[in-house]
Amino acid sequence: ATRFAELSGEAGFPPGVLNIVHGLGSEAGSALVHHPDVPTISFTGGTTTGRDLAVSCAKQFKRTSLELGGKNPFVVFADADLDRAATEAARAAFSNTGQICLCGSRILVESSVLPQFQEKLLAATAAMRVGDPAEEKTHIGSLVSESHYLKVKQAIEAVGGSAALRK
């Protein structure tokens, strides 16, 4: 988001046309939602927060745009180009460290090609560079918060022996 704002300025957007506000929803978000000079709210996140925002915005007749809790499947059929599918599935799952609503959160694979696809997906994922998200060569950066880290860790632990964390 920060880079998008920088690029919009470089593209000639006047100052103040696009504003990216970072912070906790309970503080920064609430201030924006309740400010009389903010006519429109766009939010991407969880359904509980989205519902609360919709109620607050409706009371003030503010326009809203909500993208809530997307769960996007990535589907691989037997006739797919498995190399390309694995590369794209890894990219889809880990873009923005998997923390955006349009990331592939489920991969559905036709059983006849599952073993080959798994092997290729592991290779594609292993080839991704983990590091500073500000560096162009980085594919996977840090998680946004400790609470999100714990959520990811819990998801890994919840599947028990049917999944593995690989380095």
Q: Positions of the model-derived regions?
A:
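ALDH superfamily catalytic-core signature
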Residues: H34, T40, G46-K167
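PLP-dependent aminotransferase-like
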Residues: A1-G29
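Conserved functional loop/turn residues at catalytic and ligand-binding sites
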Residues: G12, P36-D37
